[in-house]
Design a protein with these regions (language model features):
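Bacterial N-terminal signal peptides that target proteins for export
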Residues: 1-10
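C-terminal motif of bacterial Sec signal peptides marking the signal peptidase cleavage site
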Residues: 17-20
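A short, solvent-exposed, low-complexity linear motif enriched for acidic/polar residues
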Residues: 22-243, 247-259
Length: 259
């Protein structure tokens, strides 16, 4: 079933700032700041370490660098709506068409063992995420890039004894201003519970339930109606239909017991 995918998200936060920059010859009143943060995480590994070598945005036929220095992030540290800034730079105000993420290196840690995560040449030269957006002078615009980790990390070799791991990126982009969230507290979260937001037959996002507090947040959801499903490793589950998400608000489901 498709709702058993895990996801992580990249949060793109362009915000207006008035200061000089060398990326393009524009006046300070024509510039903004593009900030890119990493949020949410896959939850089938001990760690997923991704090294980004460059992050950029496309405007008027050229790429504007948002981050030009390598940065390694353990994706598992960012979950339940938390995010980390992985790039920020002043950029020209105007109409953008793409975000580009260059991945230099990657590895996964499973049961304490570190395995290289094979990065395709396309990811090294740049994952281009097509999404048109405009940064207006004096305004703020935010994007969320949702990276489906479960479908993006594939194994090679026998299913029960894999001999390698490959990165096959699957991503989606949504404007943050048009999103909301769903949260709750699981009363019995000790067996690696997972929460899913499902629209129709498609899993929109997934998050791990905190093992100690039982808290979870399905963040950056487009406005709409969702089915919320939870399960754990011993087969207990919970399903709630017709959960409405509205702009800028969190839909709190309260206390949930898996059965």
């Amino acid at each position: 079933m498709r709702y058993f995918s895990r996801r992580l998200a990249l949060l793109v936060l362009p915000a207006m700032m008035l200061a000089g920059c060398d990326n393009q010859a524009t006046t300070t009143s024509e510039r903004g700041t593009l900030k890119i943060s990493l949020a949410d995480a896959p939850i089938t590994f001990d760690a997923v370490n991704i090294t980004f070598s460059e992050i950029s945005a496309h405007i008027n036929g050229q790429w504007i660098t948002v981050r030009g220095q390598p940065m390694t992030v353990n994706l598992l540290e960012w979950n339940n709506g938390k995010s980390i800034v992985i790039g920020t730079s002043e950029v020209p105000a105007g109409h953008y068409t793409q975000i580009r993420l260059k991945i230099q290196d990657a590895e996964v840690v499973i049961n304490g063992q570190t395995h290289p995560l094979e990065v395709p040449s396309g990811a090294q030269s740049g994952l281009k995420l097509a999404h048109e957006f405009t940064i207006n002078a004096g305004s703020t615009y935010e994007l969320v890039v949702d990276f489906d980790a479960q479908r993006s990390i594939v194994t090679t070799g026998p299913p029960n004894n894999p001999n390698g791991y490959k990165l096959n990126p699957t991503l989606r982009v949504v404007p943050k201003a048009m999103t909301g969230s769903i949260s709750g507290i699981v009363t019995n979260p000790e067996h690696a519970a997972i929460a899913y937001a499902i629209a129709g037959i498609d899993t929109v996002t997934t998050t791990a339930v905190d093992k100690n507090s039982g808290y979870f947040m399905l963040a950056y959801l487009p406005v709409g109606t969702y089915t919320v499903a939870l399960n754990d490793t011993i087969g207990r589950a919970f399903v709630k239909n017709d959960v409405n998400v509205v702009v800028g608000a969190d839909q709190d489901l309260g206390m949930i017991t898996l059965q």
